[in-house]
Amino acid sequence: MVDIIIPVYNALDTLELAVTSALMQGDVRILLVDDGSTDGTARLCDELAHHPRIAVIHQQNRGVSAARNAGLQAAASEWLTFLDADDVLLPDAIGNLLALAGDSQAIQGLVTRSEAPDVPECTVQTLPSRDMLDLALRNPTVHLHTHGWLLRREICNERFNESLRLGEDGEWMMRVLRGTKTVARAQVNAYCYHLRADSAVHSAADVVREYLRTLTAAQPTLNYLDMPDAAAQYRLMHLLLMLTHGVVQEGGFRDGLRQCGAIRRLCREAFRADLRRVRWLPRSKAQAVLLMLRCGLYPLARRAILIRRRQNQQACVSAESAI
């Protein structure tokens, strides 16, 4: 059996779809953790819990990390996975991942933004945990999150850091993967992530401060892993997140000057050593922006990030209109 942990907060419009996708997975138990919802979601959770395979936990509002921790505490099956209340598991995701997991302690499926994605050739790659961690640190937005992961409960003794607000799932996944021996990566469509505009309003200062707090919390694990190049890439990808979701905003000439000044200070004060590791021949758009930052081309980097922000916002609008 697999426990599916669903942290829930004010998800009245989306929860039933998420739960339906979970029930279709077969031999599963669903743990709904209501984090102090105020819109009728708590009552809906109680109604859904009449199903024999659904249990509900109610708690005061303490944030998604506390809700996930409550789910971890209640989990009792050999395997577990997480599902956000506004996303869905794709058909046969759990069964396909279990069939490919073998002796691995964790397996990652594909995350899509479509409920009817192209079907890839079903293959699996098994990696030593250190190789997987190297890959994950270099690509944290792809690998260091809870979406699409199926985990043996025996490796999930770590708890989410409830003081973190941004990037907390990646910091937790890094600690969990540290305790594995082998990890599998499967070419299996597993999880549909419904891209939405963030309902929480964060100021630029809040975004920078919260991501820096996450990096501080992650540093002991990074020190333990002793992967300096991969750790630098992990931190630099968080720098790009800070800039994209916090510092860089639309605005006029004076706004641009002020933002470029903030970018320069952040790069010089917190990321100078990491930027020195950036390759001179970038292999991706993200690496190209990091090279601009290394070279002090802050206006050019800001422009590239603005383009990326506009693409993200358009994707959010398209996703919302499709629902």
Q: Where in the sequence are the language-model features?
A:
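Catalytic core of nucleotide-sugar-dependent glycosyltransferases
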Residues: 189-197, 202-230, 249-271
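Short aromatic/hydrophobic "clamp" motif used to bind/position activated sugar donors
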Residues: 80
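Short, acidic, metal-binding catalytic loop of nucleotide-sugar glycosyltransferases
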Residues: 20-29
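Glycine-rich, basic loop-to-helix element that forms the pyrophosphate-binding segment
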Residues: 59-75
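Conserved nucleotide-sugar donor-binding catalytic segment
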Residues: 132-206
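Conserved donor NDP-sugar-binding/catalytic core segment of glycosyltransferases
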Residues: 92-121
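Membrane-interface aromatic/basic loop that binds lipid-linked glycans or pyrophosphate carriers
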Residues: 249-323
